[in-house]
Amino acid sequence: MEKEGVTMVINFEELHPNERAELERNIFFSTLEQLKGWARSNSLWPMTFGLACCAIEMMGVGSSHYDLDRFGSFFRTSPRQSDVMIVSGTVTKKMAPIVRRLYDQMPEPKWVIAMGSCATAGGPYVNSYAVVKGVDQIVPVDVYIPGCPPNPAALIYGINKLKEKIRYEAKTGKQVTNK
């Protein structure tokens, strides 16, 4: 009989192998950091922030054909409710301070995905005096998605890579950088 308020301590070495196998199937061992990483990776809220043609592909991810909601990601319109910024399109030098301000308004922890060749490296406008040669010059980027424009499946793949990165960092305690 187990009494209320009594904590049981089980020594695994004293258990029969069948009992040990049963306990291992039904007990989940983890650290708080790993649980937080798992929860964060499965509930990403990207901010809708499209600057050019890649934004059309980003909108496609929310359609019924791809349905990003089934992965636990819900688009938010406010940076204060978002934890992922998806920069999709050409970032001009005039737009750069706004991108930085939106990034600064996001709560911690926060991540950035650069979607398309314009956000990644300037795209076809790379030699223009008015274009930033990659959004990573303004904010730290966690995942790069190549293409002009990348299709919605590529964006879903990039979001899944970000989820893997979040879980890995929570599990190991090591920061993964792109440089």
Swiss-Prot record:
Species per Swiss-Prot/TrEMBL record: Bacillus thuringiensis (strain Al Hakam)
According to the record's subunit comment, the protein's assembly and interactions are: NDH-1 is composed of 14 different subunits. Subunits NuoB, C, D, E, F, and G constitute the peripheral sector of the complex.
Check the record and name the HAMAP family matching this protein. NDH1_NuoB (MF_01356)
The Gene Ontology CC terms held by the record are: plasma membrane; respiratory chain complex I
Q: What family does the Swiss-Prot or TrEMBL record give for this protein?
A: Belongs to the complex I 20 kDa subunit family.
Q: Does the keyword Cytoplasm apply?
A: no
Name the UniProt record assigns to this protein: NADH-quinone oxidoreductase subunit B
> Which GO BP terms, alphabetically?
aerobic respiration; electron transport coupled proton transport
Q: Which GO terms describe its molecular function?
A: 4 iron, 4 sulfur cluster binding; iron ion binding; NADH dehydrogenase (ubiquinone) activity; NADH:ubiquinone reductase (non-electrogenic) activity; quinone binding
- Assigned keywords, A-Z: 4Fe-4S, Cell membrane, Iron, Iron-sulfur, Membrane, Metal-binding, NAD, Quinone, Translocase, Transport
List ligand-binding residues for [4Fe-4S] cluster: 53-54, 118, 148
Q: How is the cofactor bound?
A: Binds 1 [4Fe-4S] cluster.
